[in-house]
C-alpha cells in the first residue's frame, strides 16, 4: 500500500527528493521499535511524507505539526493527501490554520496552538532599569534573524539609508545566513558601513543581552516568490518580553502578536519607505517607544506565556 501511494505521489512529483523520502521511510519502518504506538511529523513537507509512508508500512496512526515554510511551499495536492490520512495536525498561527483548513477534508483535523514563551528564561528587566536616565547615544536598532530573502533585510537597509541625517543611530544584526556577504556589500554601497555591525550567529545568552540593550527591534518579514514566509517569529516575542519596542510587517501570523499602534508597529511587507517612516517615528519619540514596549510585554505575558 505504501509503495502504491508513493508511486502515485512520484507521478506528480518526479524528483530525487520524492524518491529519497520513500527510502527514508523504509529505514524508519524497519528500525522502529515494536512498542511505538504513533508516529509524529514535526513539519508538513519532507518529514510528513516520510512519516506517512512509514506509518502505512507499520500500520500505525500518525499526526503532524506545521509551521511556516512547510505550509506555504508544499504543493496543495500534497497537503490535501496528508491531511486526509493523518489523525490530527497542529499549527502555530491562525493564518496557517485557516489556510490548512481550506485544504483538509475535515477542517476539524487542524488545530491552532501558538508558540509560547518561557518567562523563567526570558524574565523582563525592571522598567526603571530599561528606561534609564542615560539613554543610548546613538540609539540602537537591533534585528535578529537569518540572512535569507524572507527576512526582508534588503528592505531594512534601504529604510535605514532613508532615515533623516539628524538621527543618531546604529544598526546591529545577529544571525548568519547565505545572504550575509551580499547584505554587507549593499550596506557599503548605501554608505551605511560605519553605522552597522554584523555580529553573526550568537548563542542565546548573547542574543538576549543584545535585545536588552536595544531601543528598537525590527524584523521586516516578507513573502518570497516561491511562497516562503515567516509564521510568527519567536524572536518578536522574545524582544517584546524584554520591554523593547518592536517594528515588523503585516505578514502571516505577525499581526496575531503585534497590534499595530498598540503593542508595536506594523508596515506593509516590502515597503521600505513605510519602514523608514516608522523607524523615524520610533527613534524620535522615546515616550512612544516606552508605551509600545510596555504594552508589548503585557500582551506577550497575557497571551503567549507558557
Model-predicted segments: where are they?
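Acidic anion/phosphate-binding donor-loop and adjacent secondary structure
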Residues: 75-77, 101, 117-133, 137
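Carbohydrate-associated surface elements
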Residues: 95, 116
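Conserved donor-binding/catalytic core segment of Leloir-type glycosyltransferases
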Residues: 133-161, 172
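Nucleotide-activated donor-binding/catalytic signature segment of Leloir-type glycosyltransferases, i.e.
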Residues: 174, 181-205
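Short alpha-helical donor nucleotide-sugar binding micro-motif in glycosyltransferases
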Residues: 201-203, 209-214
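Acidic donor-binding loop of glycosyltransferase active sites
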Residues: 212-229, 244
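Short hydrophobic beta-strand element within catalytic cores of glycosyltransferases
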Residues: 236, 241, 245-248, 258
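Conserved acidic donor-binding segment of nucleotide-sugar-dependent glycosyltransferases
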Residues: 257-261, 265-272, 281-287
Amino acid at each position: 500500500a505504501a509503495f502504491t501511494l508513493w508511486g502515485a505521489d512520484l507521478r506528480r512529483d518526479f524528483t530525487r527528493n520524492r524518491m529519497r523520502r520513500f527510502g527514508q521511510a523504509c529505514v524508519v519502518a524497519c528500525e522502529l521499535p515494536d512498542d511505538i504506538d504513533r508516529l509524529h511529523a514535526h513539519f508538513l513537507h519532507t518529514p510528513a511524507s516520510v512519516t506517512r509512508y512509514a506509518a502505512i508500512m507499520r500500520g500505525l496512526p500518525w499526526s503532524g505539526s506545521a509551521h511556516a515554510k512547510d505550509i506555504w511551499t508544499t504543493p496543495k495536492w500534497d497537503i490535501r493527501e496528508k491531511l486526509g490520512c493523518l489523525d490530527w495536525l497542529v499549527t502555530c498561527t491562525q493564518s496557517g490554520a485557516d489556510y490548512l483548513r481550506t485544504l483538509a477534508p475535515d477542517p476539524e483535523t487542524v488545530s491552532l496552538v501558538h508558540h509560547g514563551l518561557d518567562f523563567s528564561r526570558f524574565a523582563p528587566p525592571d522598567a526603571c532599569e530599561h528606561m534609564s536616565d542615560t539613554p543610548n547615544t546613538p540609539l540602537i536598532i537591533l534585528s535578529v534573524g537569518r540572512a535569507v530573502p524572507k527576512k526582508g533585510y534588503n528592505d531594512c537597509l534601504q529604510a535605514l539609508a532613508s532615515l533623516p541625517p539628524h538621527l543618531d543611530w546604529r544598526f546591529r544584526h545577529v544571525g548568519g545566513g547565505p545572504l550575509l556577504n551580499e547584505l554587507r556589500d549593499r550596506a557599503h554601497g548605501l554608505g551605511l558601513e560605519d553605522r552597522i555591525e554584523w555580529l553573526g550567529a550568537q548563542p542565546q545568552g548573547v542574543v538576549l543581552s543584545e535585545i536588552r540593550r536595544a531601543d528598537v527591534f525590527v524584523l521586516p518579514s516578507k513573502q518570497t516568490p516561491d511562497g516562503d514566509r515567516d509564521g510568527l517569529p519567536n524572536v518578536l516575542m522574545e524582544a517584546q518580553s524584554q520591554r523593547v519596542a518592536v517594528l515588523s510587517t503585516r505578514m502571516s501570523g505577525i499581526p496575531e502578536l503585534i497590534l499595530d499602534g498598540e503593542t508595536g508597529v506594523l508596515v506593509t511587507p516590502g515597503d521600505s519607505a513605510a519602514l523608514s517612516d516608522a523607524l523615524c517615528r520610533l527613534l524620535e519619540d522615546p515616550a512612544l517607544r516606552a508605551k509600545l514596549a510596555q504594552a508589548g510585554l503585557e500582551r506577550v505575558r497575557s497571551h503567549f506565556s507558557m
